[in-house]
Amino acid sequence: KNDSKVLFLVFDNHDVPIGHIGLADGLITDSLVEMDNIVRGDKTAQKGLISLALYELISWVFISTSCKKVYLRVFSDNFKAISIYENLQFTHINKEPLKKNVNEGVIKYEFLESNKNADIYFCYMELARNDHFKNYENIKNFNG
């Protein structure tokens, strides 16, 4: 149990679950909220539904709270997700180096102090309230 996280299921227009999106750290701080666990589980689902759901969730966060920015972290090799986040106006802030460790088939990533032995990076991206709402027409005209 983690009281600082909330997970939402995303359904298509036929009430079929196609993925999930979440919030983290929103109960700890009112200035910055993490968009978390963004997954489109059904690869056959209509393209763009997770993007629209994420846009609406971010809108709700900004309307319902005094939060000025939302952020997320994504693996640097997840080009599809990064493209989606850029279309939602998230900007790259920094990259954190990670070392991949495999133990008995379980993969875990460890943060590194330097880039020297990094296997991959965690991209930290942010979206400001004003940038989000300026993007409304682009998102609403999106047809997947």
Please annotate each region the language model reported.
Residues 40, 46-61, 83-87:
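Conserved acetyl-CoA-binding loop-helix of GNAT-fold acetyltransferases
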Residues 86-96:
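Conserved acetyl-CoA-binding loop of GNAT-fold acetyltransferases
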Residues 62-73:
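Conserved GNAT acetyl-CoA-binding A-motif
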Residues 31, 68, 121:
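Residue-level signal for beta-strand positions within conserved beta-sheet cores that form or flank
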Residues 71-82, 98-103:
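Conserved beta-strand-loop-alpha-helix junction that forms the acyl-donor binding cleft
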Residues 98-144:
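C-terminal "cap" of GNAT-fold acetyltransferases
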Residues 1-43, 129-130, 140-143:
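Acetyl-CoA-dependent GNAT
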